[in-house]
């Protein structure tokens, strides 16, 4: 990770989550942004639940200070455990795994499989291009603009918590359109 801001903000977020009395449920890694978040949580004696597939045991990637460590057989099962146990999803800067997890919880929400807040933590404008790509998908007719209401974007740690605390639940049909008539589809 080239810019320290991603590590520093993740560690701060972890501390803040712990100080709120909330738990972090994550992929159990000790490296990168999520490793920094984990260190922030444990520095404040917070609850840190790691979920990892069995094959991670041999790769020396697991954070050893999780308050609970859950092992699964597959990556798919891992995501399912995290999705089921989470009350909200905060999407920090990350790579392909983060993108995949974001789009999975977004799709599940569109299909009314959960009604939990999804907050994209856009540190340093990291997700600006992805947000613009999604807007392009709307303007080109590939998805409804209602899909952009499935998640919120926070630029600061304070905004992350405000958006979770003030979450307004929308109800969508199976195609991602708002059921309350507040859509263009």
Language-model region placement:
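A cross-family phosphate/adenosyl-ligand binding-site feature
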Residues: 2-85, 125-157, 168-185
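Flexible, glycine/proline-enriched loop segments at strand-loop-helix junctions
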Residues: 92-93, 117-121, 148-151
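Hydrophobic "lid"/C-terminal helical patch
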Residues: 164
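Active-site/ligand-binding-proximal alpha/beta "capping" segment
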Residues: 77-112, 119, 170-178
């Amino acid at each position: 990770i080239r810019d320290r801001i991603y590590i520093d903000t993740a560690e701060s977020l972890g501390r803040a989550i712990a100080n709120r009395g909330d738990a972090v449920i994550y992929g159990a890694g000790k490296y990168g942004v999520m490793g920094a978040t984990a260190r922030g949580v444990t520095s404040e004696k917070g609850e840190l639940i790691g979920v990892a597939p069995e094959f991670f045991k041999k790769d020396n990637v697991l954070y050893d200070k999780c308050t609970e460590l859950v092992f699964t057989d597959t990556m798919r099962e891992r995501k399912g455990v995290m999705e089921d146990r989470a009350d909200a999803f905060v999407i920090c800067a990350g790579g392909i795994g983060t993108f995949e997890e974001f789009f999975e919880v977004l799709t599940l929400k569109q299909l009314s499989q959960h009604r939990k807040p999804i907050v994209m933590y856009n540190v340093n404008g990291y997700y600006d291009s992805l947000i613009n790509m999604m807007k392009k998908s709307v303007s080109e007719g590939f998805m409804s603009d209602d899909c952009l209401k499935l998640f919120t974007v926070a630029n600061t740690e304070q905004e992350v918590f405000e958006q979770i605390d003030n979450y307004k639940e929308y109800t969508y049909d199976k195609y991602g359109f708002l059921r309350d008539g507040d859509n263009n589809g």
